[in-house]
Design a protein with these regions (language model features):
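Conserved N-terminal subdomain of the carbohydrate kinase-like
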Residues: 1-50
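General structural feature for long, well-ordered alpha-helical segments within catalytic domains
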Residues: 3, 25-30, 60-64, 90-94, ...
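Short beta-strands and strand-loop turn motifs
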Residues: 13-18, 42-49, 75-83, 108, ...
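Gly/Ser/Thr-rich beta-alpha loop segments that engage phosphate groups in nucleotides
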Residues: 21, 54, 111-112, 144-146
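Glycine/threonine-rich flexible loop motifs
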Residues: 27-28, 51-57, 84-85
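Conserved phosphate/ATP/ADP-binding segment of small-molecule kinases
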Residues: 57-127, 136
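Short, small-residue alpha-helix embedded
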Residues: 83, 138-149
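Short pre-catalytic strand/loop immediately N-terminal to key active-site residues, enriched for Gly-Thr
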Residues: 127-143
């Protein structure tokens, strides 16, 4: 939190990107600190590392709601979206989050099966989607963080 305060007071902030949050306690402290900031906030609700390690327990995932309420856009991948809502349909899940937290949701479709992939930006009154082809590579570590940034 001291780092947030130092950057805000010394340099100023034009936007905020929230990545991996290790506990509900930290999620709530970050939400408290960002409350009232008038800048775009991007929240990537990281739950599982590329290696498969679990990074967010149930309490942390519940606390993600506070961060989504502050966010301009949340960027969950398909498994994260399912975990946040319990719904199987990605668009229905995103609409649920948009309605509950009032932030846009960018669904990252990289976890889809097959070569054709789709991402979708769901807003209160609009949906935009993009289609593309899977790139065959082993260099996939951090792709969600890169997109969110």
């Amino acid at each position: 939190l001291a780092q947030i305060d130092a950057v805000v007071s010394d340099l100023g902030v034009d936007a905020v990107k929230i990545g991996m949050i290790g506990s509900a306690f930290t999620a709530n402290l970050v939400a408290d600190r960002l409350q009232g900031m008038d800048v775009p906030i991007v929240f990537d609700p990281v739950m599982v590392a590329t290696s498969g390690s679990v990074l967010a327990d149930d309490a942390t995932i519940a606390a993600f709601g506070r961060l989504m309420e502050l966010a301009t856009v949340a960027t969950p991948n398909l498994p994260e979206l399912h975990r946040l809502t319990g719904k199987d349909d990605p668009v229905e899940s995103a609409l649920s989050l948009v309605g509950k937290h009032r932030c846009a949701v960018l669904i990252k479709g990289g976890h889809e099966e097959g070569d054709a992939l789709a991402d979708a930006l769901i807003e209160e009154d609009n949906m935009t989607s993009w289609q593309g082809q899977r790139i065959n590579t082993t260099s996939t570590h951090g792709t969600g963080c890169t997109l969110a940034s």
